[in-house]
Amino acid sequence: SGQENPKQNDSLEVFRITKYDKNWNKIKSCGLYGANTTVPFDAGSARMTHSGDHLLVRTCHEMYKSSDGNNHQANVTIEVDMPSMTITDSYTGIMNVDYGYVSHSFNQFIKTDGNHIVALDHGDAHPRSAVLVKYNSDFTTGKFFPSYFEQVSNIDVVTYPEYTAGHYNYTGAAIGG
């Protein structure tokens, strides 16, 4: 679940992941605070996968106001240790696709390949493509993105043509699965 954060408060919980038993009794939850997020789940989807004790979430958010005065949208990745229900890693910052960042990301998918995260995002600008991203680090360590120096592998599966009639949002494409 999520909570809007229009005042850009770094101590406000904006994403909450809750664990339930098979009878829908709440067991435990964990949260992500601030996280460069004003509107969680904005203009995209929320998908999850798990492997062993690790829950991996790929979703999106509207971010804190940037230097151009706008609140841009991008993807979000969160890793949770399920037995302890603690967030072990997350990425909500601004970077480029070499770090798994896609903006705007209108649809997000996540799977695992062995001990690596594989994700697909529908980007309209950075990059303007359906981009497949593979994280090169071993997420079972609790860190899918351990350092600034460890980039991801990425490939544009489909590149969308330039759109000059206004904002980049229109791509003429839909990704399903």
Question: Where are the regions that the model predicts?
Answer:
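Beta-propeller fold detector
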Residues: 27-34, 87-95, 141-159
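Asp-box/WD-like beta-propeller blade repeats and closely related beta-sheet repeat scaffolds
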Residues: 11-16, 26-51, 60-66, 72
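Short glycine-/Asp-/Thr-/Trp-enriched loop segments that recur within the blades
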Residues: 34-45, 96-105, 152-174
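Residue-level recognition of a conserved intra-blade site in WD40 beta-propeller repeats
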Residues: 48-50, 109-112
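Entry beta-strands of beta-propeller and related beta-repeat scaffolds
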Residues: 1, 53-58, 114-119, 177
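Beta-propeller blade signature
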Residues: 12-24, 70-86, 130-138
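Short glycine/acidic-enriched loop and turn motifs that connect beta-strands
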Residues: 3-9, 62-68, 123-128
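Extended alpha-helical scaffolding regions
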Residues: 70, 79, 89-105
